[in-house]
């Protein structure tokens, strides 16, 4: 009897990798291989940008069938499906202007194959350190140097929910996701 399950989707942080050990257990790798032997396609589904996934995926001896990255804004499969939905440039400019006038706020900008921060502070360092070996490299860049020539898929300011709502309210096509 064949299985009705055709695909399985797995998050990286806290699902495939432990928040404690920052590694993928052997039992998880074996389970992923068992799914593939049953012709179940195995996908990564993450809020991470593709450029931030390699530090984890390179340690997992599994060939994934595709990724759903950036909370669904970037999807690709080995079969050639490619879906990309960047943030409207006008909204990126509004958020960038807000961030430039709030110099205490750190934000991560995610492009399809590059991620960077507008600045660094102690809170960012603590968050990144909590990821252990699964933490991607931190690059610092002035967003104004990139947003006009590179599509931005996600901007993650390190703010509370009320400030997030304020920022999203200034934009026409943006909503906060936590």
Regions flagged by a language model, labelled:
Residues 12, 80, 151-155:
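Short amphipathic alpha-helical segments
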Residues 28-126:
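Active-site phosphate-binding/coordination module
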Residues 9-11, 74-76, 146-149:
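Short, basic/glycine-rich phosphate-binding loops at helix/coil junctions
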Residues 1-3, 54-59, 170:
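Short amphipathic alpha-helices and their capping/turn segments at secondary-structure boundaries
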Residues 24-26:
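A short acidic/small-residue loop/turn micro-motif
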Residues 105-106, 110-178:
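Conserved acidic, metal-coordinating active-site core of Asp-based
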Residues 4-21, 95:
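Asp-based phosphoryl-transfer active-site loop
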